Amino acid sequence: ESATYRATVQVTQVSNQEENVVTIIKGEGDSAMDALNAVTLFNGKKPLYSHSLILVLGRSCAEEGLSHVMDFFIRYPESHPTVNILMADHLAEEILSTKQEDGKYMQARDIAELAKGGRYNGETVQTETLDVINQLRGEGSSPYLPIVRQEGEAVVSSGTAVFSGDQL
């Protein structure tokens, strides 16, 4: 039986050098909590999710329904309600594991700028955790998420996903 949830976490390793190094840690589990616990078991350190900048959901997660995942992130004590949420055109792991021309991972803050840019050019939306929770619980409203995809050595915006209830 394969794991239902996969978590891919970008971790910034602070150093004395001019630029901090970003690494990727992955975990799998039967729930979002199990997958995130597997990340913790990988390196023995508890990630500081309160510092999270983005949450990227894979297409399959969006198709299955947002309620369980969003419920976890709104109830998890270290999760922040203003984290930008994006949907990957395919796998979230591909987005967070995108390597740039210099061989370094594209950083979460740069990916977050894609959603924020939509405020200025109207090509996409910016959605935070609390927005999605309110849209899921509000009568007559449906969640929407910016869609991103990997394009070579970059992550680009590719539209907006509109949900029916909690499913894509």
Across the structure, where does each feature detected by a protein language model lie?
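A glycine-rich, acidic short-motif signal
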Residues: E1-L168
